């Protein structure tokens, strides 16, 4: 049996942790990154409110959805017409629908990757609404330092597209209890990665701990030696560069599917 290391940010990992516990799987949270709001909150809020006149908003993650609605606050009730809102997967769709209900926002069109395509930027770009050459205005809501494939592809297709960073990814604090749990585990490790940023941040955090904390300093080689479940080929390539060997790409980013696949891999 493997110990599952969940590197998702704490703000988005509760459902997965609960699913893993219900399956009676040994698991520990070791977030690679945390989510923070923008540094210039008022400026970003003003830009966001001005952008309600645009045709489409694209949320690149659940974090983008949560931070956007946090920035909108009471302003959502004062606006009668909203752009079409696009998401990359079913988890994000459910999250967006929940926030729309909470804010009393009705009649908002939601688009997502069509059936049979991946829950990703590439999948969303296959949607017919984003295939047509158009001068529609599109706002991509994300964090600094992400991929620019969406932006460049939409601009190449003739859309008037721009980005707005509504949140930041910052390194998470290493929790001593989590470090100790992994250090004390005598068996193999199975790590879930949900972003390339988490991989880089956690590597930096654990390498920086070499001198200050001997236990934490030993973790990175052990983690790399174990098994890995990644969400994308991009994460797989990065893990290979960091000397990971056994890397499986998840069938789906959906929480229940991840829990089921982790259960299968943990018992293998």
Enumerate the predicted regions with their spans.
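Conserved beta-alpha
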Residues: 1-268
